[in-house]
Amino acid sequence: MNNFFQDFNLLFSSSLFSSYMDWFYNFNCSLLFGVLSFVSTMFVYLLLSSFYFKSKKIEYQFGELLCSVFPTLILVMQMVPSLSLLYYYGLMNLDSSLTVKVTGHQWYWSYEFSDIPGLEFDSYMKSLDQLELGEPRLLEVDNRCVVPCDVNIRFCITSGDVIHSWALPSMSIKLDAMSGILSTLSYSFPVVGVFYGQCSEICGANHSFMPVALEVTLLDNFKSWCVGLLSD
């Protein structure tokens, strides 16, 4: 049943948390599809059959019991994995080894590594004439945010003007950036690669040209990147 929803699925999961979210989505879709099939089948059967019910009793206790038990079971089946995901999400925010402050502006992102003095930069979308071979249009930036893999990182999201939203769909990350408010999220990236997202809150004329590019690399490469950026 899960394969049926591949065309309507989330992006390819690149972390443990996003894999759990993907499984939960497929599980709910399969469950709801089963409920829809059962109700539709019963509706068509009763509509086309000559069956009729005749009773002097106004109440039908067994039917009322079924109508109470089955919805309760369905809700319990949804509640158990949902609470497990919520508990796992809470564990992710317990501690962190690196803090990255992300500030949204019209229409670019600013990154500041609070644990590394002087390491801060702005990230703008690359124009068409700046793109190199293989770089995605409207998603590549001039300065990627580089973070090490297998390290718990705390992201502090805020805004310098209007409301923005820092989103990485493949990681199941979406945090609103609001002026005067600091939204935090701790995350560990197990996969090396470059992951793209966009601002997911309409923030003005160039809202569509405000991409997010996060590069996850090995710890040694991250240290070399920090040294190179600080030396510049």
Swiss-Prot record:
Main location: mitochondrion
SS bonds (residue pairs): none
Keyword Transmembrane helix: yes
Binding site for Cu cation A1: 164, 199, 203, 210
An example Gene Ontology molecular-function term: copper ion binding
Topology, Mitochondrial intermembrane side: 1-30, 90-232
Enzyme class: translocase
Matches recorded under InterPro entries: CcO_II, CcO_II-like_C, CcO_II_C, Copper_CuA, Cupredoxin, Cyt_c_oxidase_su2_TM_dom, Cyt_c_oxidase_su2_TM_sf
Subunit structure comment from the entry: Component of the cytochrome c oxidase (complex IV, CIV), a multisubunit enzyme composed of a catalytic core of 3 subunits and several supernumerary subunits. The complex exists as a monomer or a dimer and forms supercomplexes (SCs) in the inner mitochondrial membrane with ubiquinol-cytochrome c oxidoreductase (cytochrome b-c1 complex, complex III, CIII).
PANTHER family linked: CYTOCHROME C OXIDASE SUBUNIT 2 (PTHR22888:SF9), CYTOCHROME C OXIDASE, SUBUNIT II (PTHR22888)
Described function: Component of the cytochrome c oxidase, the last enzyme in the mitochondrial electron transport chain which drives oxidative phosphorylation. The respiratory chain contains 3 multisubunit complexes succinate dehydrogenase (complex II, CII), ubiquinol-cytochrome c oxidoreductase (cytochrome b-c1 complex, complex III, CIII) and cytochrome c oxidase (complex IV, CIV), that cooperate to transfer electrons derived from NADH and succinate to molecular oxygen, creating an electrochemical gradient over the inner membrane that drives transmembrane transport and the ATP synthase.
Protein name: Cytochrome c oxidase subunit 2
Organism from which the protein derives: Ascaris suum (Pig roundworm)
Gene: COII
